[in-house]
């Protein structure tokens, strides 16, 4: 897209592909962001987000005034607001802009991006987001992007479990699961989960496009936010329990399509 890019990660090999395509490797967060016009982060867990933004030599301390900060990790809406407030105090506009679409969307530049923060800052960041995503929406004040991602993950939880249950039922009823998937994919039951993860469930292909352990983190955040609002989410709660049971069996590094394992007869 023509933008000069500097990258930093804890493990240099994680950035190797980006460096091979022209990005410049930096040895610290401070070195990476010191001259940046826009800083983009995508890490694993809320504690990782806190570390890269708030620690000594971190982003808020090291980024130049005016640089746009965009955290694209799925994390707590409360943390997104904290980053926004701390960054604003140093003259750094900040957006929470989590994504959906998995590894396929990332590689193809077709991610869904949902952003919270000040709308004029979102407009300034939009050309960069357009290099990564296809469905890019401004959702409102700081934290709104993360709240939208919570809604996204709630919907995915039910959809993924629904596909696994449908295929498990088809098998138990003596149907050809592949033929069943083909038939129901042409009707109103169709979903991204059905089209993309349904075939993987049939093949028992559990290579991660999105890790179970990270989905557990997302669902836990969503349930926490719901509980803060005295909102019951029974489907999310049940699916979270299924995934936690899989993680307890050592399967946290498998892809979310491995939920079909929860329906295997022992």
Region locations from a protein language model:
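ADP-ribose/adenylate-binding Rossmann-like module
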Residues: 60-80
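Residues in the short beta-alpha loop(s) of Rossmann-like NAD(P)-binding domains
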Residues: 10-11, 45, 118
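A short, aliphatic-rich alpha-helical micro-motif
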Residues: 30-34, 60-63, 129
